[in-house]
Amino acid sequence: MKFSTLLIAAGLLCISVHITAQPHSRKKVGIVLSGGGAKGMAHIGALKVIEKAGIPIDYVVGTSMGSIIGGLYSIGYTPEQLDSMVRRQDWTFLLSDKIPRSEQNMAEREAAEKYVFSLPFGKDAKTQAIGGLIKGQNLANLFSELTVGYHDSIDFNKLPIPFACVSENIVNGNEVNFHKGVLATAMRASMAIPGVFTPVRLDSMVLVDGGVVNNYPVNVARAMGADIIIGVDVQSDLKPANELNSAGSILGQLINLM
């Protein structure tokens, strides 16, 4: 076990003792899960440690990947179920706009076998490119499948664990905090990385990744009523110029800047 994990566990144990020692006036605990791309999967491990320490969770707030893990946790998924779900996904397919082979016609199957990827051309190409390279429909479908029973517009404060997530409205640059709505839509909006995924259009708003404006939304958890904040920040240090030499490294840097 890494020293950092031991340190976290020790800190959580102290919090647990402090909370359980005051059963009649228990402090409210808020979990804050930052954005951070694929590193956001580390949130699952953090939730396991928090549960093992016996700490009650009263609120969950997340940005980007933190909104996905947090949103699913808030409706009852256990850390073990989340871990299993992440491991069994075909992420190459999910992070693309490919149509499942079973739903393709013959022409689409032939095109899929011929080209590794495609870019939009034609009169709508400029608009699509500005929006993002990936429409994210496969991810949206997954979120919809995982949130069965929560497809209607609902009050997130009435979920098994009250939840909120963060996005940005690029129409005016304002931060948008989702406390109600369709859960899958809120999660998709919170992780719409500019230039990578198309924005989510909702009412008069055009929504992108919440990491642009608030990648570590402690203030949102405080406003919900949390007295104690347990934050999980998985942002990475920025890379120097000589390490930004591939599309993947540049994309990772952009995510970390958010």
Enumerate the predicted regions with their spans.
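Bacterial Sec-dependent N-terminal signal peptides
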Residues: 1-26
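Patatin-like phospholipase
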Residues: 20-63, 71-258
